[in-house]
Regions:
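Conserved C-terminal helix/tail region of periplasmic/extracytoplasmic solute-binding proteins
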Residues: 332-404
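Short, low-complexity disordered leader/linker segments with a strong preference
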Residues: 1-31, 375-377, 381-388, 392-404
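Short, glycine-/small- and polar/acidic-enriched structural segments
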Residues: 28-184, 197-213, 218-231, 383, ...
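Secondary-structure end/capping motifs
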Residues: 246-359
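Short glycine- and hydrophobic/aromatic-rich loop-to-beta-strand nucleating segment
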Residues: 121-122, 236-239, 243-244
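Soluble non-cytosolic domains of exported or imported proteins
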Residues: 41, 68-72, 87, 158-162, ...
Length: 404
């Protein structure tokens, strides 16, 4: 009986405290809103799907998506805390940390990879008839021919970003030194408009903007990024340092929701719906037919060059778990490219920087809880358009032998 009275007294006291807190203007703090940025590109799909299909809500996180104008804006907002994280170029944190794309030493953390493949290099109509689809042998002569009557300029989306590196790798494989042409930075959604007014002769960007250029007759797809390196790392979930260190439970739940979205996206029957959602003005704001076609692996090349069908290396988001592991070796590879192309004068401490910026332990924890196989790392690998093997344990040997 005494215990019953004691429990009743505690309940009354608890209720009184709640009433007192409300009357004094106090309230239970609301759940924190997590703000994630994205650039209007087809591969922002994991964030859009996690939001639209309720995966963020399923894992108990209140996520607000923020459409951003450029990768530079994304960088600044992650670093100053306006964004907790974003759909980001995988190599951006390395570019920023090494001082190529931002203030040296600035830390942006990579939590997981969101996508492979699905980017391309588009050439203007000036190159129509001079070079065909995936024809690398004729590019140098075509550049020389166009250069006879105008300066040849190529655009990418962020210094040291993935598109910058795909462009430089393509130029090198074609026998064109990247220092012999102009390379400028243009935000992804502005690429087509800039080519239309003749601001550049080619660009490297993510979809759907290559597809839009081809369907509008402004340019044609010369090569897709998966032809440069099949199943390459492309976009990642990149977060600010504070979010990665002080709010790990929320971050883990964001990652779980994104993994579920990535799985959903790799069911091909879902891609039509994904394209429809992405095409909305508040997301990518591009023709649904163009988004859908390239999501399904169908590339209308443009310039009367026909259609290329990709069967197993179109844009991938999960691929039985192969996509999502953020490998240390990938970070080392991108930093090796910076040295290869003279973007850095002094070699960084490759392992130290990669391990500092990639949250391998956190990803492994989340992956195991979601039954995602963590991929083996630090093994040598080779891209499609190079003959030289990259050994992440010896980047200097690769740099010495790679075409510049």
């Amino acid at each position: 009986m005494k215990n019953i009275h004691k429990n009743a007294s505690l309940i009354v006291l608890w209720a009184a405290l709640i009433i007192l807190s409300i009357t004094r203007g106090y309230s239970i703090p609301p759940k924190r809103v997590i703000k994630l940025g994205f650039i209007p590109l087809t591969d922002c799909a994991p964030l859009v799907i996690a939001k639209e299909m309720g995966f963020f809500a399923k894992y108990g996180v209140d996520v607000q998506l923020s459409k951003e104008a450029s990768w530079a804006v994304v960088r600044d907002k992650i670093l100053n805390g306006e964004l907790d994280g974003a759909h980001c170029l995988f190599s951006m944190p390395f570019s920023v940390y090494t001082g190529i794309g931002g203030k040296s030493g600035s830390e942006m953390k990579i939590a997981m990879i969101l996508s492979n493949n699905g980017q391309a290099i588009t050439l203007s109509k000036d190159f129509c008839g001079l070079v065909g689809f995936r024809d690398l042998k004729k590019v140098a002569a075509a550049v020389k021919s166009v250069r006879a009557h105008k300066e040849v300029t190529f655009a990418m989306t962020f210094p040291g970003g993935t598109h910058d590196i795909w462009l430089r790798n393509w130029l090198a494989a074609c026998g064109v030194n990247s220092k012999s042409v102009g390379i400028i930075t243009i935000p992804p959604p502005q690429m087509v408009a800039n080519m239309k007014v003749d601001n550049m002769e080619g660009f490297c960007v993510g979809e759907p903007w290559n597809g839009v250029a081809a369907t509008q007759g402004i340019g044609f797809t010369q090569i897709s990024s998966q032809d440069i390196w099949k199943n390459h790392p492309e976009k990642a979930l990149v977060v600010n340092k504070a979010f990665s260190e002080t709010d790990k439970e929320d971050l883990k739940n964001v990652m779980k929701a994104l993994i579920e979205a990535c799985r959903w996206l790799d069911v091909m029957g879902n891609r039509k719906k994904a394209a429809l959602l992405l095409s909305k003005p508040n997301y990518v704001n591009a023709p649904v037919q163009v988004i859908e076609a390239r999501l399904m692996g169908s590339t209308d090349i443009g310039c009367d060059l026909g259609v290329q069908k990709y069967k197993d290396d179109y844009m991938l988001f999960y691929n039985n778990g192969i996509v999502n592991t953020p490998k240390i070796s990938y970070g080392i590879w991108f930093m090796a490219q910076y040295m290869r192309f003279g973007m850095l004068n002094t070699a960084p401490n490759y392992n130290e920087v990669a391990k500092k910026l990639i949250m391998s332990d956190l990803f492994e924890e989340v992956a195991k809880s979601m039954n995602v196989p963590v991929q083996e790392d630090m093994k040598p690998f080779k891209t499609n358009i190079e003959t030289i093997v990259f050994d992440p344990k010896n980047p200097a040997a690769y740099i010495a032998g790679a075409k510049k």
